[in-house]
Amino acid sequence: MDIRKTYVIIFFVGILTISFSSYNIGQTRLVVIQEQEPHCIGPCEIAFGNRPCNEECTSQQYAYGFCDYQTKGEDNPQCCCYTS
């Protein structure tokens, strides 16, 4: 009797797992992230980090900003602002 009970429990757990995974797949919405070009407003002060850059960007009505080390290289990071 114990083996039959174990198999029934495993069966119901399997059915429950499949039903939840099918539910999630059916309800998933695809979110398209658009690649946006940053608006770089000037060089970053390496000693201060991202905080002054973010504050400057938010004061200019951007959502956020940070020091971008890829725009002009590691030696000359730029403060780049983003809208979203």
From Swiss-Prot:
Compartment(s) where it occurs, according to its Swiss-Prot or TrEMBL record: Secreted
Domain of life from the UniProt record: Eukaryota
Record keywords: Antimicrobial, Disulfide bond, Fungicide, Plant defense, Secreted, Signal
Pfam family, one: Defensin
Disulfide bonds: 40-81, 44-67, 53-79, 57-80
InterPro entries: Defensin-like_dom
Region forming the signal peptide: 1-21
GO CC annotation: extracellular region
One biological process term in Gene Ontology: killing of cells of another organism
Chief site of localization: secreted
KW Calcium (keyword) present: no
Stated family: Belongs to the DEFL family.
Protein name per its UniProtKB record: Putative defensin-like protein 63
Organism: Arabidopsis thaliana
